[in-house]
UniProtKB/Swiss-Prot annotation:
Pfam families: GNAT_acetyltr_2, NAT10_TcmA_helicase, TmcA_N. Keywords: Acyltransferase, ATP-binding, Cytoplasm, Nucleotide-binding, RNA-binding, Transferase, tRNA processing, tRNA-binding. It comes from Methanopyrus kandleri (strain AV19 / DSM 6324 / JCM 9639 / NBRC 100938). This is tRNA(Met) cytidine acetyltransferase TmcA. The lineage of its organism: Archaea, Methanobacteriati, Methanobacteriota, Methanomada group, Methanopyri. Residues 480-663 form the N-acetyltransferase domain. It is an enzyme of class 2 (transferase). Belongs to the RNA cytidine acetyltransferase family. TmcA subfamily. GO terms for cellular component: cytoplasm.
Amino acid sequence: MPDKAEVFFDEGVLDFADVDEIVLDVGEEALAEALAHRHRRMIVFQGDEGKAEAAGVVTAGAADVLFDVRDRPISVLYVTDSLKEDTYARERYEEFRRVLEGFAEEANFEYELEALTFSGSKRALGTTWDLMVIDLSYDLDPDAIGRLVETVRGGGLVIFQTPPFDRWRNMWTAFHKSLVTPPYTLDHVGKRFNRRFIRKLKEHDGVWIVDTDEWTAEPEPSEDVDLEVEVKRRERPDLDPPDDAVLPEELYRMCATEDQFRALIRFEELLESNGKTALILTADRGRGKSALLGIAVAGAGVTTDVYDVVVTASEPENVAVLFEFLLEALRELGVEYDVERDDKGNIVYVETDDFVVEYERPSEASEIECDLMVVDEAASIHVPILERILDNNDKVVYSSTIHGYEGAGRGFSVRFLQNVRKRRDVRLIEFKMHEPIRYDSDDPIERWLFDTLLLDAEPADLDKEDLECVKEMRVEFEKPDLRYWFEDPEGEEELRQFIGIYVMAHYRNRPSDVMVLADAPHHEAYALKTETGKIVTALQVAREGTIPRDVITKMRRGYRPPGNVIPDLMVQHHDALDFPRMKGLRIVRIATHPDIMRHGLGSRALKELAKIAKKKDYDWIGTGFGANEELTRFWLRNGFVPVHISPNRNPVSGEYSVAVIRPISEEAEEIINRANFEFRIKLADWLGETHRDLEPEVARLLFEPMSSLRYRPTLTEGQLRRLKKYADMVHTYEIAADAVRELAKAYFLDTEDRPELSEEEELLLITKCLQRWKWADVADVLGEEVPDLMRSLRDLVGLLYEEYKEDLQRSAAVEGIRKAVERLADKGLTGTVIVEVEEGEPKEVIIRREERLEL
């Protein structure tokens, strides 16, 4: 391949398109810079006419040059909102393809063209392209842009087609239309994200903007640009493996950068270590972490005694690159293998004669013991799962993206690594990869991408004065002006502080979250700021409710109005048809600066939000969260009432989702308290079925009474006799378990005059009686011996029996009467029923004038 290139676009390409020569000038200059620095460059064609042909001209001219430079077919990816026939998007694609195909045939260069829609953009993950064209004429999908732009290699071009900027600033995209929720219309949707996106295109180096209606360019092409350039190429590391290397030399030669080479050495340290060891690999996107892991896993399986390897990530698609390089490494080593794929075509299982590699979802992986556990994109997995994985395995690799659309690696570092570093039983090996694989460092298009999508947003740096403000609670609760944040360059710093807190928090962040905040008509932001002006707590809330009656009628039949999570839940699970017409706020996200957690700032923010809600005549504030003990305690402490728990654990977080609501109005309070009581009744039953694995501490908190309600236990005469005999040490627990369970339910559902039990006693009732755990499992959780727990439970039952004795006898009496009447009715007898009761129990039932039946 030549070391020099003459970046001249053959003017013959203009025969296939009606565009101005300025398109050639811009294309040549952009490609020359890209090749000289092994960076990417971007060209934006904005206008109504000619942009598809202009994109075709630059792509064709660049592909002609690159075919000589690369000495292989040039890969081109075209992405748009739709490829359906008879759409404007398809029409633009065909115009683009006509230019590219026509000139390729004339100039005799080879290329490979693939077209995707934004909805299918995940297919581009792990791929690499020489040239990319993204049609933004109708839609602006931030998540897709985050995935796609990074896949273009150094020396290549990213080309955007957009509407005229003047119109685009005020235009609704397809994404915007998805933000419309009742009672709002499209007219209520903002365009702040569009305007910031345009501003960022103008601010950054390496970006040319061509107006295809006026045929002008900004910046203008330089007249003295040198189009004969030295082509900068990626140099593989000229390094020798360690003399005592465990992994084969062939695998070290596969490393594309020195960082990958060094990371492989650190992986060997993990393999040779004794005891519990964790290797932490962190990097920005596109640094080759996943590829390196695939190479490393192949080496571990072939050359060590590692047999079973488990790979986990939030989705199977996230480990596609890992499996791709695993197979490539096996081929390099001459190892035969078999592959299994899921129904979407993702590799999920690889087997060789020496070892197996299997993909598992995070919640399932956290319960597995294996020789080697690999966690890819750990940032998107909740910390409790990451910790359980380490608890169960001696050799674990955690790979995490620092800046990226899947999650926040720095949040992973802050929360997870802080905990791991405190553990004396874990050896920690850390390595950060800096060198990009596809392009060289300091790439201007990467800087544009990170800035535009706020992938590198960080919380404010807090100095001594800021910390003093927090300590003394000298903070103000503010509702920021989103227009100022997104449209005024001076608002950029506060926006970055706000989003940066979420990046550090437990939320999985995507670029589309920023667009929702910017433009969704029902979303708004609140911030807790120090007197010094630093944002320390960030809240994003969604206005819900005030749903029209005709929509509520549809909801009864299963219709789920978009953007109304809490009202929908209350109708579907509690048949609360008055609730959707009420006005509420759903907390979408709340997070506090990681340096000042547990200072009461989150609670202060919720208190201030409740004041605003009351002042503005809202009826309720609600939210949903992954239920662990700490978060559940936080929400309940702040006056939120649980009304629902999901039937299944989230496959990524491994937690059940709980919905809680804080009533503001009296009308809402009545509905919410009733829903809470019904929820607790259902939870008492679910704990023995769908939620047997719910953390007992969480269950205990969810049972906390939120209002004064009376629950009367119900037992038959037979159950009551067995319960007595169990309390009197005649029966074992198993004989009376059904009756004891009803007694435990009575304790957790009753809120009037119930006895005070300790936390340990309540956990015993939950685990043994409601969740029906084995005695050994209860003992493991409570840290007690089984015989001691047996005695404690019998004593508890005796105490509760005395407390609910009258209710239990009354229920047995009623049950006895019902059965007696049924027996008489079966005989066809009629008359007046007379019940004689002694000490709360029925002694006989009389049918006056006809027959007497002894009980």
